[in-house]
From Swiss-Prot:
Region (Disordered): 1-37
Composition skew (Polar residues), residue ranges: 21-31
GO cellular component: large ribosomal subunit
Record field: transmembrane: none
Keyword Secreted: no
An MF annotation (GO) of this entry: structural constituent of ribosome
Family per record: Belongs to the bacterial ribosomal protein bL32 family.
Top-rank taxon, per record: Bacteria
Xref: PANTHER family: 50S RIBOSOMAL PROTEIN L32, LARGE RIBOSOMAL SUBUNIT PROTEIN BL32
Protein name: Large ribosomal subunit protein bL32
Amino acid sequence: MAVQQNKKSRSKRGMRRSHDALSTAQLSVDATSGELHRRHNVTADGYYRGQKVINK
């Protein structure tokens, strides 16, 4: 089992975690339906960049 050699300070722990924050999702409005969707993702009705890509 791994055991640390020395105790890491609160500062070192915070520095390591400084890149762990989540950013908010980027949203766009679909040109054809006006639906709000995540950027670079297909909308719920199957459109991507104004073209139908998924047939249900």
